[in-house]
């Protein structure tokens, strides 16, 4: 894996999303500097809120960008 890894959480509940994100963080090698979490927002903000709350302290920073359905977990600055 290298660069940016995209993780689509559509259709997952909070537990499944957490498991998927944790697995992506474990698999992220030295070449991965960002995990783009696609959680959506039209169906509600539960996944977005969980991602931002639970992973803010575990990564270098969160990048929320202009798309409210995406949160980037920045592992290291590029």
Predicted feature descriptions by range:
Residues 1-78:
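Long, charged, low-complexity intrinsically disordered regions
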